[in-house]
């Protein structure tokens, strides 16, 4: 179905996997279907997902951490060009201040509440 290294639009990702078109952790039937990550907000993608303070975003990240299994991960390479980089699973989720501080410095963001560490499966 998905081909590693191939580019997809968000509409194509939505049609294939379901979930919302604009969030970076789309969900369908209560499960996160994939991750769509930008390097601007997630400079270590696809190995980490940096989670901000929005309650909706935090809830979705917690769902990903709890659901188990693997998800397809896409990294944005250009306008509406999302590269499929493979299937990943959650290695660990951290709200530890040491991890938060490290990734806030790396990303330049100041609103992080959680870091989700992924590993390729």
Region annotations inferred by a language model:
Residues 1-83:
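Acidic, glycine-rich low-complexity segments with interspersed aromatic residues
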Residues 58-61, 75-121:
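Aromatic- and Lys/Arg-enriched surface recognition patch
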């Amino acid at each position: 179905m998905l081909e590693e290294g191939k580019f997809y639009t968000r509409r194509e990702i939505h049609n294939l996997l379901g979930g919302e078109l604009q969030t970076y952790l789309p969900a369908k039937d209560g499960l996160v279907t994939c991750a769509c990550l930008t390097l601007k907000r997630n400079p270590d993608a696809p190995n980490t997902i940096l989670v901000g303070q929005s309650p909706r975003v935090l809830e979705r990240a917690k769902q990903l951490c709890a659901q188990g299994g693997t998800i397809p991960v896409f990294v944005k390479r250009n306008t509406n060009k999302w590269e499929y980089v493979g299937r990943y699973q959650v290695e660990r989720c951290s709200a530890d201040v040491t991890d938060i501080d490290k990734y806030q410095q790396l990303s330049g963001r100041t609103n992080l509440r959680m870091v989700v560490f992924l590993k390729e499966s």
